[in-house]
Amino acid sequence: MNQFLRFLPVFFALTLGACASNEPAATATTAPPGFVVGSITHETSNGSYRLGIAGKPGQRIREPSVGGGLLPFSNQTDDDLKEKGGTFELELPPGEYRIVRWSIRRGSTDTQSAQPFEISFTVESGKISYLGNLHFDPHWENVSLRDRASRDMPILLKRTPKLATLEVAYTIRKDANLERLGNGYKSRSDIPFIMPLPAR
């Protein structure tokens, strides 16, 4: 009997340990994303016009875009914006982000801002961050980020009704006009080099 009592605490310890190990592990909850919105407009021929958004170091750059038509002179005028281009909406996890570049894709040619730049903004869970209007001048020499909230937001709410119930957490400064983003541009072509065959 005394020998049984001596091992009883060990038995209870093992039993409690087994019960604890059978409990389901707590699952981490992820905060709902925020909504990043804005518009991209241009005064040139067709292509895919993009805005580069960076998060934490090591994360891939996200690029909301408008356009992309293959025919260079097809109509890309947005009837609501009354300009060539369009609006964009992007879901991102809550956190701190930066606008770091702009770029254009036309056929096999990629063009992007000549120098990096940074415009910081915040994304909050379940809220809207309005980045403004990225506008490309005819020669891409004075690409600007402008406040067009009074025009853009009603259009965005009409196109994405779920945004109408959300609070705006961030917006570009009222009447802002940030000019010459990236100080010009640089281009790169992906046309493959074909080695000519020697004449026979």
Residue ranges and their predicted role:
Residues 1-19:
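Sec-dependent bacterial lipoprotein signal peptides
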Residues 19-73, 104-200:
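Primarily secretory-pathway and cell-envelope proteins
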Residues 68-84:
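Short, acidic Ser/Thr/Gly-rich low-complexity loop/linker segments typical of extracellular
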Residues 93-101:
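A short tyrosine-centered beta-strand micro-motif
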